[in-house]
C-alpha cells in the first residue's frame, strides 16, 4: 500500500548551493598567495574543483522522477526497490536517506538527499510526518 508518492523535481537550491561552494573554493585558490613555480599546483587544484562542480551538478540533476514510499522503510525510486537502512536525518531544507537496494543489480547502497524544494509543500510536510512518526528505528538500523 502506498503511503506517500511524489514526482521529484531538480532542486534549484541545491544547484545554487553547489555553485556557491565550488565558486568560493575557486576564489580562495585564485586569491591565495602562491609562490613562484607553483602554477601547476594552482592549476591542478582549480581543475579538481571544476570537475567536482560538474560531478556535483550531475548528481543533483539525477535526483528527480517518481518516488513512492510503501511503508516506513521501503520505497521505490528510479524503477528500483530500496530499503531505508538508518534513521532518516530530517532538517528544515531536506532529508537524508540511507538506502540499500533489495534487488541484485547496480549499486547496493546509496544516500539520497531529498531537498524540500524538489516537491510541493504538502508533499514535503506529509513525508516529514511519516518519517518522524516511525518509532521503531532500532539503534539507527532496521532489521
UniProtKB/Swiss-Prot annotation:
The organism of origin for this protein: Serratia sp. (strain ATCC 39006) (Prodigiosinella confusarubida)
Taxonomic lineage from the root: Bacteria, Pseudomonadati, Pseudomonadota, Gammaproteobacteria, Enterobacterales
Disruption phenotype: No effect on aerobic growth on succinate or in LB. 90% decreased synthesis of prodigiosin antibiotic, decreased transcription of flavoprotein desaturase PigA.
Domain of life, source organism: Bacteria
InterPro entries xref list: YgfX
Membrane topology of this protein: Multi-pass membrane protein
Induction: Transcribed under both aerobic (with succinate or glucose) and anaerobic (with glycerol with or without fumarate) conditions. Part of the sdhE-ygfX operon.
Chain segments annotated as transmembrane: 12-31, 36-54
Keywords tagged on the record: Antibiotic biosynthesis, Cell inner membrane, Cell membrane, Membrane, Transmembrane, Transmembrane helix
Periplasmic compartment segments: 32-35
Pathway(s) the chain acts in: Antibiotic biosynthesis; prodigiosin biosynthesis
CC annotations in GO: plasma membrane
Record Pfam families: Cpta_toxin
Subunit structure, as described in the record: Interacts with itself, SdhE and as in E.coli FtsZ and MreB; other interactions are shown but require validation.
Biological process terms in GO annotation: antibiotic biosynthetic process
Identification of the protein by name: Inner membrane protein YgfX
Effect of residue 117 to A: Very low Pig production, no self-interaction, no longer interacts with SdhE, protein accumulates stably in membrane
Amino acid at each position: 500500500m502506498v503511503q506517500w508518492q511524489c514526482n521529484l523535481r531538480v532542486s534549484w537550491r541545491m544547484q545554487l548551493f553547489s555553485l556557491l561552494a565550488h565558486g568560493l573554493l575557486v576564489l580562495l585558490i585564485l586569491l591565495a598567495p602562491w609562490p613562484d613555480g607553483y602554477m601547476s599546483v594552482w592549476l591542478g587544484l582549480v581543475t579538481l574543483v571544476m570537475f567536482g562542480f560538474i560531478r556535483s551538478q550531475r548528481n543533483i540533476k539525477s535526483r528527480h522522477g517518481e518516488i513512492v514510499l510503501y511503508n516506513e522503510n521501503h520505497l521505490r525510486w528510479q524503477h528500483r526497490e530500496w530499503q531505508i537502512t538508518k534513521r532518516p536525518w530530517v532538517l528544515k531544507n531536506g532529508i537524508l536517506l540511507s538506502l540499500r537496494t533489495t534487488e541484485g543489480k547496480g549499486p547496493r547502497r546509496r544516500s539520497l538527499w531529498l531537498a524540500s524544494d524538489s516537491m510541493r509543500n504538502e508533499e514535503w510536510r506529509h513525508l516529514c510526518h511519516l518519517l518522524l512518526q516511525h518509532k521503531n528505528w532500532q539503534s539507527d538500523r532496521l532489521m
